């Protein structure tokens, strides 16, 4: 499709926010997210990073950190863990066979270390899953994305056999489960997204603006719908037949009063919401930020940075108050170490927290 689609950025898109001056998150005042216990303060160690790169995303695979770099010939920079030692750079940007476009993003980076990382291949209309080895990355599997030429779809694989797709219909956004064999829809739930869409005279979507569109994090048969503009996570179980069963909703109620607040709070300097998220086999980690944004300089003064931890049934089990400002997190598969970075700083160090201290 050649139409231009625009998604209103929230805390999860602060990189674009700080450069473009666009921010749309809820402004419910200072203090911890409503209803949560006081977090445990944790102290940071730092590890120096010698490569001069500008990360757009990071992920974890096979015990290694994988950083997607902007504006460099090499696309992926791979680091050993827990020391964050540089191993190799892999993948080149270009238009030739086996090369990558300028925009590259893992669709499952928040799922944690599952043995592979998946890119959406817009040229080939496939999801390409890569393994991360000690010396190189390798294509493991491809799955069709089943695009729709009349509208905008945001999809990602779930466990084998199923895709999760966000799609606007009738002025509302829905989460669909679809077969990865033929793209057919099995189940759907409505999302609390504020949508503004324009269509041409043939019914094809011409533009799309979304606010409060959630991130979909998946692990085994569980799916977490993580809203960033309000502090809210919905936990689902996905059956072998692709049916969605709501297990628990935690955080703010998504009522009309909350949505109306979102409509009127786009330009406030005080902002809060969920920015980072990462999962392990046991837990989902969400990074809650309370910040003061200077619209002139595009700099965000992070006042509060709390990591809330839930099990996959939606129960909050822990909460940590990070020592250093952070905008993105990774967590080791044994739930012992948390890695954090602040995209407002140069990528010359990574902060490490021992969650067992």
Regions of interest found by a model, annotated:
Residues 23-26:
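C-terminal motif of bacterial Sec signal peptides marking the signal peptidase cleavage site
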Residues 31-53, 312-315:
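A short helix->beta-strand "capping" segment at the edge of beta-propeller domains
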Residues 55-61, 105-113, 154-159, 205-220, ...:
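Structural signature of eukaryotic scaffold interfaces centered on beta-propeller domains
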Residues 85-122, 143-147, 323-327:
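Blade-loop segments of beta-propeller domains
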Residues 123-126, 130-171, 191-196:
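Asp-box/WD-like beta-propeller blade repeats and closely related beta-sheet repeat scaffolds
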Residues 176-180, 299-315, 352-355:
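Beta-propeller blade signature
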Residues 286-302, 348-353:
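Short, conserved, GDST-rich strand-edge loop motifs in beta-rich repeat architectures
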């Amino acid at each position: 499709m050649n139409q231009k689609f625009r998604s209103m950025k929230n805390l999860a898109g602060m990189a674009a926010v700080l450069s473009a001056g666009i921010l749309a998150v809820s402004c419910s005042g200072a203090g911890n997210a409503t209803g949560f216990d006081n977090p445990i303060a944790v102290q940071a160690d730092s590890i120096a990073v010698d490569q001069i790169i500008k990360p757009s995303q990071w992920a974890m695979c096979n015990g290694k950190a994988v950083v997607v770099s902007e504006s460099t010939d090499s696309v992926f920079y791979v680091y050993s863990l827990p020391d964050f030692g540089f191993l190799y750079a892999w993948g080149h940007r270009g238009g030739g066979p086996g090369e990558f476009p300028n925009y590259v993003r893992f669709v499952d980076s928040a799922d944690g270390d599952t043995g592979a990382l998946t890119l959406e291949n817009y040229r080939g209309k496939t999801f390409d899953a890569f393994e991360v080895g000690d010396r190189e990355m390798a294509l493991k599997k491809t799955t069709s994305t089943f695009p729709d030429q009349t509208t905008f779809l945001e999809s990602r694989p779930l466990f084998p056999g199923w895709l999760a797709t966000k799609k606007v219909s009738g002025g509302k956004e829905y989460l669909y489960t679809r077969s990865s064999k033929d793209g057919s829809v099995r189940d759907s739930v409505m999302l609390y997204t504020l949508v503004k869409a324009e269509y041409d005279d043939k019914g094809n979507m011409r533009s799309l603006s979304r606010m409060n569109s959630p991130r979909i994090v998946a692990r085994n048969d569980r799916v977490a719908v993580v809203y960033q503009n309000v502090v809210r996570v919905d936990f689902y179980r996905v059956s072998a037949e692709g049916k969605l069963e709501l297990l628990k909703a935690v955080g703010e109620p998504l009522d009309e009063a909350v949505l109306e607040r979102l409509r009127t709070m786009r330009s406030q300097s005080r902002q809060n919401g969920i920015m980072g998220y990462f999962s392990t086999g046991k837990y989902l980690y969400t990074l809650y930020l309370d910040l003061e944004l200077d619209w002139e300089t595009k700099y965000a003064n992070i006042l509060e940075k709390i990591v809330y931890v839930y099990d996959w049934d939606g129960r909050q089990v822990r909460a940590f108050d990070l020592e250093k400002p952070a905008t993105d997190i990774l967590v080791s598969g044994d739930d012992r170490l948390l890695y954090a970075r602040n995209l407002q700083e140069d990528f010359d160090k990574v902060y490490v927290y021992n969650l067992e201290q």
